[in-house]
Amino acid sequence: MKARIKIPGAMLDGVHRDLHRPHPFAFERVGFMTAGVAQAGADRLLLLARDYQPVADEDYLPDRGVGAKIGSDAMRKAAQLVYQGRSALLHIHSHGGIGRPEFSGIDLRSGAEFVPGFFHSVPRMPHGILVLSQDSATGLLWFGPDQSGDYVADFVRVGAPYRKFGERP
């Protein structure tokens, strides 16, 4: 299944600003994006970003072994977001830099641990993880709690300037 994620330009700009704010002890910021999901062909899904919620400062946990560690309160708040709106839930953070970013080993391991839990709130939607750079993105989507993640095919910034990025072969 190939998936495209469309994000309104103003929202994407706001996500970038939020993820680059300093935190008292975390090395990076984390947020959650919700998205509606539409079938866009026999083997293609379209995710339309709806909302972005930053993780509150008090929901970060000190851990010098990772860029950011968030607690169960952050996960609970995110689950409440999607439960009410029947949306896909996407955990999002930034690695900065230019070009298509890649997930770290920690990103991949932790995503494989926590993303299946999102299916308890909204079982019939895909859920996943995204990592941004300054001009691109990479995403993994899970289509069920017992499946592995599939890479997002591409991303589209909607609005002026319209831009496609993060394409995967």
Name these PLM-found stretches:
Residues M1-A88, G96-P169:
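Conserved beta-strand-loop surface patch within small alpha/beta domains used
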